[in-house]
Swiss-Prot record:
Organism: Entamoeba histolytica (strain ATCC 30459 / HM-1:IMSS / ABRM)
Binding residues annotated for Mg(2+) 2, in chain numbering: D118, D121, D257
Binding site for AMP: S198, H203, S227, K230, R244, Y251, D257
Protein name (record): 3',5'-bisphosphate nucleotidase
Binding-site positions, Mg(2+) 1: E69, D118, I120
Protein function: Phosphatase that converts 3'-phosphoadenosine 5'-phosphate (PAP) to AMP. Is also able to hydrolyze inositol 1,4-bisphosphate but with less efficiency.
Highest taxon above the source species: Eukaryota
EC category name: hydrolase
Temperature dependence: Optimum temperature is 50 degrees Celsius. Active between 10-60 degrees Celsius.
Length: 317
């Protein structure tokens, strides 16, 4: 079964979303930032992208459900006014429609047709004007069929996309008609690998990463970047292994932090599992509650890396 229509829609709305976030970033971000209960920053860009994306999905596939990160329960009115200003450049939605559109992302996931959105993954990177990504995936019963990542600050702006069974492509953020096929690296030895991880120490256990890379005899320093841009780096051969290491087993990864990147790496010939080598299960709701941490790789290095990761993290509770 083809999902060409879903892929075309995802590419189009991620491209526009990159324009929205770039526009927001051109303004001073300090007064546009809000701190959520989990202490991660939320920007006008997050809400603006979610409003726009949800509206476009709902127009085209009105019966589909959307699992997205943000909601409007605590959005201050001054922030919301800025959201409306940015959204209305690209949409004719009224203010009340924008609020309703943001809250279309409240699905609990699971069975059926679902879109999975992280409007700005790597908000701290966005605020630093470094790496962030607009992340959109489409799944049926937890099986990812389409994944698109927009990375506006990566090498002048890139979009990577995949449809299950059709490989992965990379586009300029300004041209989604002419993509080129991408593939993971063929690096055969861990001693030669380029390893990437999150910038923020709250997102991964960097001290354990250091132990793991020493065990694997990695000679290159880690490449640290925010967001699912790391999946893009693996899929395009710019890096060989990505580790996201939990500090304890109580933390549950959110599906919007991984859905698009997971498919793109796999379609580029790589492998993505949790730290125990188990496939990721997106069918259980808004979190990967049956998985712990992430290992993504070019496939060649996967088994050796996972074995060392399991050993180093064997005391996790």
């Amino acid at each position: 079964m083809s999902f060409d229509k879903e892929l075309a829609l995802a590419l189009e709305i991620v491209q526009v979303s990159c324009k929205i976030t770039t526009s927001v970033a051109e303004h001073t971000l300090t007064d546009q930032t809000q701190i959520k209960n989990d202490k991660s920053p939320v920007t006008v860009g997050d809400y603006s992208v979610q409003a726009y994306v949800n509206k476009k999905i709902h127009e085209t596939f009105p019966e589909d459900q959307i699992v997205a990160e943000e909601d409007t329960k605590t959005i201050p009115e001054d922030i919301f006014a800025k959201v409306c200003k940015h959204v209305q450049i690209y949409s004719d939605m009224k203010d009340d429609e924008i609020r309703k559109s943001i809250d279309l992302g409240n699905s609990t996931g699971g069975k059926g047709r679902h879109w999975v959105l992280d409007p700005i993954d790597g908000t701290l990177g966005f605020l630093r004007r470094e790496q962030y990504a607009v992340c959109l995936a489409f799944m049926i019963d937890g099986d990812i069929k389409v994944g698109v990542l927009g990375c506006p600050n990566f090498e002048g702006g890139l979009i990577v996309a995949a449809q299950k069974g059709c490989g992965a492509k990379m586009f300029s953020v300004n041209d989604i008609k002419n993509g080129k096929d991408i593939h993971v690296s063929t690096t055969p030895k861990t001693s030669d690998m380029c390893f990437c991880e999150s910038v923020e120490v709250s997102h991964t256990d960097q001290s354990r990463s250091k132990t793991i890379t020493e065990r694997l005899q990695v000679t290159k320093p880690p490449v640290r970047m925010d967001s699912q841009c790391k999946y893009m780096a693996i899929a395009s051969g710019r890096a060989d292994v990505y580790l996201r290491l939990p500090r304890n087993l109580s933390y549950q990864e959110k599906i919007w932090d991984h859905a698009a990147g997971y498919l793109i790496v796999k379609e580029a010939g790589g492998k993505v599992t949790d730290i125990y080598g188990n496939d990721l299960d997106f069918s259980l709701g808004r979190t990967l509650c049956n998985n712990h941490g992430i290992v993504a790789s070019n496939g060649i290095l996967h088994e050796e890396t996972v074995n060392v990761v399991k050993d180093v993290l064997s005391d996790l509770k």
